[in-house]
Swiss-Prot record:
Gene3D superfamilies (UniProt xref): 5' to 3' exonuclease, C-terminal subdomain, DNA-directed RNA polymerase, insert domain, RNA polymerase, RBP11-like subunit
Entry keyword Plastid: no
Function description: DNA-dependent RNA polymerase catalyzes the transcription of DNA into RNA using the four ribonucleoside triphosphates as substrates.
SMART domains: RPOLD
Protein name: DNA-directed RNA polymerase subunit alpha
Gene name of the encoded protein: rpoA
Length: 332
């Protein structure tokens, strides 16, 4: 059986094509037929769900007691400021958590460059807009930044009745990977024309490079599968394995399968959101603009998506898929 493994092709080259500072294409070829989708789907899921990173988990803004407090002299609502801070990309070189402060005298724009950092803290997107001061007054805030992995809603970290007034907790998306897609193209080796070429398109927030992200995901996959290499016994016999689809089956499920409250489900359907894939592409800001959909319904939606390893604000390529059919787009 071990000798038979030598008959399988191994990739001969890995090419990295930078598309921008934080985006690159990683090309792997040649692969046996079907291996492109098998490896591509596994790497994509790991890149989106299992990459360690940092996120703002708690914010204190001078003069703000809760997220619905209107800040005099500030153009943005508190909710908008918190959503802006969610996009902050920070690299912690030594510590697992840190509290940073930001202070700016108005009028003017407050950006990530105004955040006071320590020697072991790096802001990767200093141009990030945080707030706009419209009067001659200061803007003061403190940010707690922590290491983590995946997506962690506030409800999974602490009970609502234990929070201190003025401490604004944020749902944390720790992954430094913003977007991942893959395509499988045809490859040829000598007379064989039925081979695969895997093309990964990876975009990060700058905390890690696309190359580093792919290396980490591949190492994680290797470590998780290594236990099977030492299994005793023969290989199971059975039919041919089904090729994994490029699109996560969960995304193809109707909204009703999420078992949301009737109010939340009806609000989503009124906005032509009929499938999970439709929902995850919407942002918190967009959903909060939905008539009759409040913060409570939004939290319910985020918690439910988190249970399936999903979150709002995801970018899906080639959505909707052709297999969804025309009937899906008019479902209600």
């Amino acid at each position: 059986m071990k000798g038979y493994l030598k008959d399988f092709l191994k990739p001969r080259s890995v090419e990295i094509e930078p598309l921008s500072d934080n985006r690159a294409k990683v090309v792997l070829e040649p692969l046996e037929r079907g291996f492109g989708h098998t490896l591509g789907n596994a790497l994509r899921r790991l890149l989106l769900s299992s990459m360690p990173g940092t996120a703002v988990t708690e914010v204190e803004i001078e003069g703000v007691q809760h997220e619905y407090t209107a800040v005099e002299g500030i153009h943005e609502d508190t909710v908008d400021i918190l959503l802006n801070l969610k996009d902050l990309a920070v690299r912690l070189n030594e510590r697992d958590s840190v509290t940073l402060s930001v202070e700016k005298q108005g009028p003017g724009s407050v950006t990530a460059a105004d955040i006071a950092t320590d020697h072991d803290v790096e802001i990767q997107n200093p141009d990030l807009h945080i707030a706009t001061i419209t009067h001659e007054q200061p803007f003061k805030a403190s940010l707690k930044i922590e290491r983590g992995r995946g997506y962690l809603p506030v409800t999974a970290r602490e009970e609502e009745d234990t929070r201190t007034i003025g401490h604004l907790a944020l749902d944390a998306s720790f992954s430094p990977v913003r977007r991942v897609s893959y395509a499988v193209e045809s490859a040829r080796v000598e007379q064989r024309t039925d081979l695969d070429k895997l093309v990964l398109d990876v975009e990060t927030n700058g905390v890690v490079t696309p190359e580093e992200a792919v290396k980490f995901a591949a190492s994680l996959l290797r470590d998780q599968l290594s236990v099977f290499v030492d299994l005793e016994g023969g290989l199971l016999e059975g039919g041919d394995e089904q090729e994994e689809p490029e699109i996560d089956p969960v995304l193809l499920r109707p909204i009703d399968d999420l078992e949301l409250t009737v109010r939340s489900a009806n609000c989503l359907k009124a906005e032509s959101i009929h499938f999970v894939g439709d929902l995850v592409q919407r942002t918190e800001v967009e959903l909060l603009k939905t008539p009759n959909l409040g913060k409570k319904s939004l939290n319910e939606i985020k918690d439910t998506l988190a249970e399936h390893g999903l979150s709002l604000g995801m970018q899906l390529d080639n959505w909707p898929p052709p297999s969804l059919g025309d009937r899906a787009r008019i479902a209600g």
